[in-house]
Amino acid sequence: ILPPQETGLTYNSWFGKFHLEMTWWHLAHYGLWNKPECMEKCFGWFLYAQKLARQIAKRQGFNGIRWMKMTDPSGIEAPSNVGSYLIWQQPHFIYLAELLYRAAKSSAERKELLKKYAGTVNATALFMADFAEYDSIRDRYILRGCIPAQETLKADSTINPPFELSYWHTALQMAEKWRQRSGIDDKGEWDSIINKLSPLAFNEDSLYLAAETAKNTYTDIRFTSDHPALLGALGMMPDSKLINK
């Protein structure tokens, strides 16, 4: 079973190609509606495609696997001057796997889920940890070299988009739990990243910015005319220390 195409069953967008950043919208609710089997149907494709995702990460000099944005049944990354820079699809497999684990009704079922998916969860997180860059001047980790979810910011000048920061923070913690459940002593390998990930940037009016570098978030139409990504930082994602209270 393949992941659903970007627009689901209503329209035939991009000739039916599925865009992995949209997988969460189409599947996550099943984990909360006591229908985890509906969510898990496409996990086999992820296991199949991870070989190609690993090649992408290796080619770019990263550990683990980097999930492609736009693809098809073959798992090959479709060419794009935007899609290849997106990262918000990366944590989805971790998030959905965690929902599966929480929905499991027995220890045997949970053990089987760990057996099937822990390796892919771990490899997904390895890329995320490697992608986070340490800023020695401010003793923090930052995200850059990416196009945020709203697709209106430039990869070469954007630092710390808020939704992606929140998702990194949440998913790395989930991945650590999967390591612990699998009996892996990781010695807190990702703790430093989780604890020192940059907080969400805000302006003098205490309004969150589309990115730390997007100082004119509320005066430049580029930042207010596409995906409301700021809502995802504390809408899709749970509360965290990155949120200014």
Regions from the language model: what does each represent?
Residues L2, Q50-Q55, M128-D130:
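Short, mixed-charge, low-aromatic patches
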Residues L2-Y30:
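Long, K/E/R/D-enriched contiguous segments that form extended
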Residues T7-G16, F62-A118, L126-S192:
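The feature captures the catalytic groove of carbohydrate-active enzymes
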Residues H19-Q55, L86-S107, K115, P162-K245:
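Active-site core of glycosidic bond-cleaving carbohydrate-active enzymes
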Residues R54-K58, M70:
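Membrane-interface coil-to-helix junctions
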Residues V121:
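Conserved functional hotspot residues or short segments at active or partner-binding sites
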